[in-house]
Amino acid sequence: IRQADIVIDYKVNQKEILQILEKLCNSSIYAYKNQICEGFITVKGGHRVGITGTAVIENERIINLKYITSLNFRIAREVLNCSNKILGQIIDKESNSIYTTLIVSPPGMGKTTMLRDTIRRISNGIPEINFKGKTCGVVDERGEIAAMYQGIPQNDVGIRTDVVENISKAKGMKMLIRSMAPEVIACDEIGSKEDVEAIRR
């Protein structure tokens, strides 16, 4: 809940946190180890649970999290057609193509929600403006766009969309270009020099 704090008179202990985590991981925390090392897991429905604790480092990489201290539940929701207002700005109707587009806003304002719906509309096509659907490739590095669960997108990202997740943007873009020949590539959270270089290529 972004706009209000709800405080209850109950102190959760570490044993209870681990029990909750085990249930979220279907009693197989090991199967979710890679996601846990990234600080979150994605569960069925596309909901995301942030995890904090003590990082175990090896060769400058996080190989585990121990002493889990907090869980932060982010309830996923789709807002269909929220991209309607911007589609006219990013579509070249004459050539039936997409302009290079960057969505920018402060945290928590709906960038990912807007991006997801934009991908869906571009992928499906928009008959009302005679826009034919495009093959889309999504690099879902943190699993927030398509919210894949056991290989199945939990969010509607369109009928012509291929998704690769849990991979860096640079590697994911190369993979999609080499194997899927997308007409449009989308990704979320451009935050590093490597991300910028991958896009510029």
Where are these regions (language model features)?
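N-terminal accessory targeting/assembly segments
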Residues: 1-45
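P-loop NTP-binding catalytic core
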Residues: 29-97
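Conserved nucleotide-binding/hydrolysis micro-motifs of P-loop NTPases
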Residues: 48, 56-57, 78-80, 99-101, ...
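Conserved RecA-like P-loop NTPase ATPase core
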Residues: 51, 140, 185
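Glycine-rich phosphate-binding P-loop
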Residues: 98-120
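Residue-level preference for the first positions of well-ordered beta-strands
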Residues: 100-102, 136, 184
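P-loop NTPase switch/communication element
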Residues: 123-174
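Conserved P-loop NTPase nucleotide-binding/switch module
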Residues: 180-201
